[in-house]
């Protein structure tokens, strides 16, 4: 508990340091068009939070990006399991996964703009950009499963279901957590980028684009802070779900 409090305090002081530095630099520049001050950004965020379309934009973007992320999780697990059990599938998927990891995000967004409606653009881009990370992490976790545990399960004739739950899932959860957190950051970056380029009505990307057109730097910073907060909440929810799975497996 004391260690957690110290960590929280250190992180809090670090955040305060950067906010103060931001305020000092903004004060020195003294041009809101170039760099908005933290106080101006906070005021804009509070004002925006009481507007109806603010929450509509938040829910629209959050739902689409997180939907894409969880679709990527499901698809990545299925493909990783297939690759683990069938070498031919692993060989077949290798060039595809390697290619996806190398393709620039902007190229992916433009390609999907040609293929699909802008409303679903952030979902598809999030899936496409995060799938390789999830797939590689889960596959590595499966390949690192302790062979001695599998032999022991075979000797004691442990059922396939128990083997999956208590050996495979428990072993791959740490890989799923680390890969998932990395993928989540990519999902938000690529998803918002897709919205800025595609400009779907009622999205965060739309208001970011408008802020750029009208040179509204305060609003731009305000929405950037909102995106950071949404990403932070997403990470906490994901980690909680992983820990919940661990507790269920351990019977706590």
Language model segments and positions:
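Transmembrane-helix boundary motif in ABC transporter permease subunits
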Residues: 67-97
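Short cytoplasmic-facing helical segments at TM-TM junctions of multi-pass membrane proteins
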Residues: 141-176, 208
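Non-cytoplasmic
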Residues: 179-229, 239
């Amino acid at each position: 508990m004391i260690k957690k409090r110290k960590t929280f305090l250190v992180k809090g002081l670090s955040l305060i340091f950067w906010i103060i530095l931001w305020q000092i630099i903004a004060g020195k520049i003294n041009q809101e068009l170039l760099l908005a001050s933290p106080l101006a950004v906070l005021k804009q965020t509070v004002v925006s939070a009481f507007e109806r379309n603010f929450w509509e934009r938040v829910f629209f973007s959050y739902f689409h990006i997180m939907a894409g992320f969880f679709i990527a999780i499901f698809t990545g697990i299925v493909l990783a399991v297939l690759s683990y059990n069938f070498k031919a599938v692993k060989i077949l998927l290798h060039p595809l996964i390697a290619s996806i990891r190398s393709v620039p995000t902007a190229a992916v967004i433009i390609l999907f703009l040609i293929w699909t409606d802008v409303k679903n653009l952030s979902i598809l881009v999030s899936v496409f950009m995060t799938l390789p990370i999830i797939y590689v992490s889960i596959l590595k976790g499966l390949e690192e499963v302790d062979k001695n545990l599998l032999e022991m399960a075979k000797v004691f004739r442990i059922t396939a279901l128990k083997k999956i739950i208590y050996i495979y899932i428990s072993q791959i959860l740490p890989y799923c957590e680390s890969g998932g957190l990395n993928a989540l950051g990519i999902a938000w970056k690529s998803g918002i980028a897709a919205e800025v380029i595609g400009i779907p009505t009622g999205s965060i990307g739309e208001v970011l684009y408008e802020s750029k057109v009208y040179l509204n730097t305060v609003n731009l910073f305000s929405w950037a802070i909102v995106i950071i907060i949404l990403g932070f909440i997403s990470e906490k929810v994901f980690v909680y779900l992983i820990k919940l799975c661990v507790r269920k497996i351990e019977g706590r």
